Swiss-Prot record:
Entry's transmembrane regions: none
Gene3D superfamilies (UniProt xref): Chemotaxis receptor methyltransferase CheR, N-terminal domain, Vaccinia Virus protein VP39
UniProt-listed GO biological process terms: chemotaxis; methylation
Alphabetized UniProt keyword annotations: Chemotaxis, Methyltransferase, S-adenosyl-L-methionine, Transferase
Primary role: Methylation of the membrane-bound methyl-accepting chemotaxis proteins (MCP) to form gamma-glutamyl methyl ester residues in MCP. Methylates the McpS chemotaxis receptor.
Signal peptide: none
EC number per UniProt: 2.1.1.80
Coiled-coil residues: none
Pfam families with a match to the protein in the record: CheR, CheR_N
Span of domain CheR-type methyltransferase: 1-275
Protein name stated in the entry: Chemotaxis protein methyltransferase Cher2
Binding site for S-adenosyl-L-methionine: 73, 75, 79, 116, 145, 201-202, 218-219
Organismal lineage: Bacteria, Pseudomonadati, Pseudomonadota, Gammaproteobacteria, Pseudomonadales
InterPro entries linked: Bact_Chemotaxis_MeTrfase, Chemotaxis_MeTrfase_CheR, CheR_C, CheR_MeTrfase, CheR_N, CheR_N_sf, SAM-dependent_MTases_sf
């Protein structure tokens, strides 16, 4: 596979237009590792040829396969821990006080392989076990990703031992998963039932998503340019109910937009409240 500078630049432009991801100039190795097998299968010898093939058939399956390969990321259960503790100890109790009798509605944006929305669902179950009857109308979690392949896998709720080992305690494994044969586990139906998976591009219109009380958009914005990041944050704000909360990744910060979000210092961690 050839990754000449001109070919690589063409591919960078294509990927940013397709899904907003801005590849660094030193990411040829990443592109090669993600696309080598696909390009060999298609008989494509360079990134320039790949882009030309996609442009010739912009609605073809090759475009989706390439975007899938470049946006697929494995993640962890209960990543960074604190967001899920803040959710249980601060945000859900506050929601119940301010919205008696209403259903909690959450969005897990760019949910990848599904660990985040299922972790959220487990955290909600843990809250309900400790606070019987308080979340009377229950909760809905809308989980979106650009990758159709990942969403298909997410919906099954099945994971191998390697994925299970990444952040999941034995206690939660025993409580929330059923064994599905050697080295495989499935999320229990009660946890899966809260989660609705949808295909969604963060650059598209947000109108179909509706309004949310809480949005998790963690470890996603680092892949976008500053302008695209700002645009996405403004769009997310449009989906948040007044006073709703945005959770970003531990290494991400919301710089700017003081008219839209207020920083809330938790212990530990930081979240953002919609004005």
């Amino acid at each position: 596979m050839s990754t000449g500078n001109l070919d690589f630049e063409q591919f960078r432009v294509f990927l940013e237009k397709a899904c907003g991801i801005l590849l660094g100039e030193n990411k040829q190795y990443l592109v090669s590792s993600r696309l080598n097998k696909l390009m060999e299968q298609q008989g494509i010898k360079s990134l320039g040829e790949l882009v030309q093939r996609i442009q010739a058939q912009p609605r073809g399956g090759l475009r989706e396969q390439v975007v899938d390969a470049m946006t697929t990321n494995e993640t962890l259960w209960f990543r960074d821990t604190y967001p899920f503790e803040v959710l249980k100890n601060k945000v859900i109790p506050e929601f119940i006080r301010n919205n008696p009798g209403q259903r909690l509605r959450m969005w897990s944006a760019a949910c990848s392989s599904g660990q985040e929305p299922y972790s959220i669902s487990m955290a909600i179950d843990e809250f309900e076990r400790s606070n019987l009857g308080q979340l009377k109308m229950g909760a809905q979690i809308v989980a979106t990703d650009l990758s159709g392949t990942m969403l298909t896998n997410c919906k099954t709720g099945e994971y191998d031992s390697l994925a299970i080992a990444r952040g999941l305690s034995q206690e939660r494994l025993q409580r929330y998963f059923d064994p599905k044969g050697p080295g495989r586990w499935a999320v229990k139906p009660a946890i899966r039932s809260r989660v609705e998976f949808r295909s969604f591009n963060l650059l598209d219109s947000y109108a179909s998503l509706g309004k949310f009380d809480i949005v998790f958009c963690r470890n996603v914005l680092i892949y976008f340019s500053a302008q695209v990041k700002k645009d996405i944050l403004l769009r997310i704000h449009s989906t948040l109910k007044p006073g709703g909360y945005l959770f970003l990744g531990a290494s991400e910060a919301l710089n700017g937009l003081p008219d839209h979000y207020q920083m809330v210092q938790c212990s530990p961690g930081i979240i953002y409240q919609a004005k």
